[in-house]
């Protein structure tokens, strides 16, 4: 089981946030990587086919836990911090386009293929400050 919590909401461009990660299970782990990711996605028609394009616009590694940190029979608890970039595009969804922010946990077990868990987060539009003259 993999759980992830963030300290507050809404998230805005330039905001800082604390997070909490918990993973339990009986498998031995090599590593766990936690990343903040933004993906842009578009759906369009080409002839009679529907096409889906996805582009990773941003990725930042937040934490890497290796074997040294993963020697627990209980469960793994980990606190972390992350920031939404000041210039970040807010989350967005329309019929054919979307901008999606998420926290991605990549787990690499000792003897099984690696797997990922994604946790969507919503970034609200920032408040633009007007320059005073």
Mark where each language-model region is.
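C-terminal beta-sandwich interaction modules and adjacent acidic
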Residues: 1-133
